[in-house]
Amino acid sequence: GVLRRSHAKEKLIMLTGVAWGTLFWVYLYLVHTGAISRLLNAVGINMMGRDYIWSLAKDYYQFSPTFIGLGFEAVDAMVTRFYEIGLIDVAYPLHNDILKVFVELGFPGLCFWCAFLYLILPWYWTKRYGPEAGILYFAILNPLSMTYLTDNTAFYFWCTMGLRMIPLAVCCFAKPTKDPA
């Protein structure tokens, strides 16, 4: 009964995290090869220059498990350089947080970032306060994750604080189920 449903919810929460991580790697590969740009352009979606700037970024990273990244703020410096040498008219960001994290932190960094946001935090909320807290966490993170694909929202204050404050508010009114450690 109840225990089985609770266990099923916990599995669903972890499966959701794994699914997002997998999607991000597939998406990153499609961005790297240009396949996502060709697909979206073929169906008439105006990428508003995203495809162009993503293609410029390609020279600065390798899609490989051995790629360790260029460091924090490397993407901002890269885009500024594109502007300075006249490749772009406006120094706007990549509009792709997944690509940004990969270029800056590399394969291990993106793996850690995904594991923390999509596995460790939901696991903690679920183990400490029950599956409803984990479900709420993903109810917030799922739509945000969609914006990570073509926008710059992963590090906005309002996104990151909302992602943490709403589950935290639920936890303040819930009794801990058990110690997650």
Protein language model annotation of sequence segments:
Residues 1-7, 118-127, 169-177:
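Structural signal for the C-terminal ends of transmembrane alpha-helices
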Residues 1-4, 29, 33, 105-109, ...:
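Helix-loop-helix junctions and helix-breaking kinks within/between transmembrane helices
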Residues 2-43, 59-62, 72:
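A membrane-periplasm/extracellular boundary helix in multi-pass inner-membrane enzymes
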Residues 16-25, 66-77, 162-169:
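Juxtamembrane/interfacial segments around transmembrane helices
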Residues 29, 121-127, 148-155:
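Transmembrane helix-loop junctions and nearby membrane-interface residues
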Residues 41-105:
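Long extracytoplasmic/lumenal interhelical loops at the membrane interface
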Residues 104-144, 168:
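Hydrophobic transmembrane alpha-helices and their immediate junctions
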Residues 137-147, 152-181:
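Transmembrane alpha-helices of multi-pass inner-membrane enzymes
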